[in-house]
């Protein structure tokens, strides 16, 4: 499926081919791909029509694939806020080096041809062929199933993740996009489902999924999440749908007449919900840097991210920056599974928090669990959260005794409750009836969960628990325990440690 990204989904709104010549550029965001150090480039540019947000994407053979110009004021404001005010502003290049200047000049000369190829039927057919190709010589295309927003692996058309647990640099919005991608009720572009055909070029989802997506983006409290929200809900104006049981034809005769009627869920479209961005519209002067700037005489102070990177790499400069600011990282490193980005670190405490969240992933993958309102093993789980086998919760409690829960995640542990279930053979199963292996679940009070609950209260009373940084998903949510824990801890470290980290 794939959440339609802010800068990629707007392809439907691209205007006709006009010559674009930006006079000045700033806020350059570069991301490499395997085989190409310049896989994507995003920047603010000023042309004859005013300030705009430009995006370009190349393949591993350095061929320009996609080029986008977007001049919605909300998107420009969000991108500018991300560049100027966020702790991750060091990922942006303000003064391009020689290599980046050459890339900008080449892009400028190819811009019109790139847009013509996108608008032509031949170009559309080539893109579809690329997406559907599975030949061995196109392995890099299978690995990158769609274009994503720089710094994310799930926000865009398709995703670029190697596995389901991998997240990009912008962990928060990427987590939201990944959860939205897993919505069980969707209608793909130009497909028929739930009694209606989606004539749009974007997937539409159930309204509950869109509501959770918007809530997740709001809870991040950063500009890249606002960019996603503004694009998806305000610019693209993608509707959602609700399902209602109605009488409809459930079986058709071969000549087209209805053979049988029955109750079936049918989709009813609802208008999109407006996204209110959370960034502060501060009155700041904006002066784009010239495309061919003079080298600065005042090198910036080396940040701790680069200091850390030097311990593992012999590379000291990059070709996309001027020597004056070569100490600043110019490319967003790709997120690795299980390894948090430096921007979210706060020493060993963060690593411990990440390990604890990973322990919840094992709980989510527990083989024996009963989902909310589900009857399994002859037991109805009437609660609004999953009920797990006692072996799974006992393993979690044993781990948490060695690794204290992350500060601020109280509500996540509250959702676990203090009960679990055991499996026992049925007592009234007579021999020869084929039910000797049929077990029934017995709900019991878990002493190990009660001890965990008391321990959590003890830490909170001592003041080490901290305040909850953001609301977790409401009971009954489909978001996993691991995702909720990761979402909370990332918000905590972002608010408490990022500014100190990047300013040191």
Curated annotation (Swiss-Prot):
Disruption outcome: Male mutant mice have reduced fertility associated with reduced sperm cell motility, aberrant acrosomes and flagella resulting in poor morula development. The litter size after intercrossing heterozygous mutant male and female mice is significantly smaller when compared to wild-type mice. Nevertheless, mutant offspring are born at approximately Mendelian proportions, have normal survival, appearance and behavior. Mutant mice are resistant to both passive systemic and active cutaneous anaphylaxis.
Biased composition (Low complexity): 314-324
Source organism superkingdom: Eukaryota
Cofactors: Ca(2+)
Annotated catalytic residues: 180, 210
Function: Secretory calcium-dependent phospholipase A2 that primarily targets extracellular phospholipids. Hydrolyzes the ester bond of the fatty acyl group attached at sn-2 position of phospholipids without apparent head group selectivity. Contributes to phospholipid remodeling of low-density lipoprotein (LDL) and high-density lipoprotein (HDL) particles. Hydrolyzes LDL phospholipids releasing unsaturated fatty acids that regulate macrophage differentiation toward foam cells. May act in an autocrine and paracrine manner.
Name assigned to this protein: Group 3 secretory phospholipase A2
Organism: Mus musculus (Mouse)
């Amino acid at each position: 499926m794939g959440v339609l990204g802010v800068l990629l989904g707007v392809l439907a709104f691209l205007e006709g081919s006009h010559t674009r010549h930006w006079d000045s550029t700033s806020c350059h965001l570069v991301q490499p791909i395997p085989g190409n150090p310049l896989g994507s480039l995003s920047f603010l540019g000023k042309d004859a029509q005013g300030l705009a947000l430009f995006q370009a994407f190349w393949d591993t053979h350095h061929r320009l694939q996609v080029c986008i110009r977007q001049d919605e004021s909300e998107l420009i404001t969000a991108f500018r806020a991300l560049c100027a005010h966020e702790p991750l502003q060091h990922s942006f290049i303000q003064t391009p080096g020689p290599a980046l200047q050459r890339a900008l000049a080449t892009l400028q000369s190819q811009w019109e041809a790139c847009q013509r190829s996108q608008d032509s039927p031949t170009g559309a057919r080539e893109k579809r062929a690329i997406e559907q190709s599975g030949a061995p010589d196109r392995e890099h295309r299978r690995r990158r199933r769609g274009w994503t927003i720089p710094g994310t692996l799930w926000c865009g058309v398709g995703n670029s993740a190697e596995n389901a647990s991998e997240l990009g640099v912008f962990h928060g919005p990427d987590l939201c996009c990944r959860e939205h991608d897993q919505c069980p009720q969707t209608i793909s572009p130009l497909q028929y489902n739930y009694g209606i055909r989606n004539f749009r070029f974007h997937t539409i989802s159930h309204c509950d999924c869109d509501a959770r997506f918007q809530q997740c983006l709001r809870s991040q409290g950063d500009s890249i999440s606002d960019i996603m929200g503004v694009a998806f809900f305000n610019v693209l104006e993608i509707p959602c749908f609700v399902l209602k049981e109605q009488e409809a034809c459930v079986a058709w005769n071969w000549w087209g007449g209805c053979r049988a009627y029955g109750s079936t869920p049918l989709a009813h479209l609802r208008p999109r919900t407006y996204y209110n961005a959370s960034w502060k519209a501060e009155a700041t002067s904006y002066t784009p840097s010239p495309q061919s700037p003079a080298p600065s005489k005042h090198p910036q102070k080396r940040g701790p991210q680069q200091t850390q990177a030097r311990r593992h790499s012999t590379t000291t400069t990059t070709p996309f920056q001027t020597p004056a600011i070569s100490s600043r990282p110019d490319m967003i490193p790709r997120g690795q599974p299980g390894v948090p980005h430096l921007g979210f670190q706060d020493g060993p405490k963060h690593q411990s928090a990440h390990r604890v969240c990973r322990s919840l992933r094992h709980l989510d993958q527990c083989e024996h669990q009963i989902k909310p309102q589900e009857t399994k093993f002859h037991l109805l789980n009437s609660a609004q959260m999953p009920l797990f086998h006692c072996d799974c919760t006992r393993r979690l409690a044993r781990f948490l005794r060695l690794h204290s829960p992350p500060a601020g995640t109280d509500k996540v542990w509250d959702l676990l409750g203090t009960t679990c279930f055991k499996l026992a053979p049925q007592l009234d199963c007579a021999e020869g009836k084929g039910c000797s292996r049929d077990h029934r679940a017995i709900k019991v009070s878990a002493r190990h969960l009660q001890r965990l609950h008391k321990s959590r209260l003890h830490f909170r009373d001592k003041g080490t628990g901290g305040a909850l940084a953001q609301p977790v998903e409401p009971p009954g949510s489909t978001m996993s325990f691991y995702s909720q824990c990761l979402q909370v801890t990332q918000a905590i470290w972002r608010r408490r440690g990022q500014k100190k980290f990047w300013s040191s």
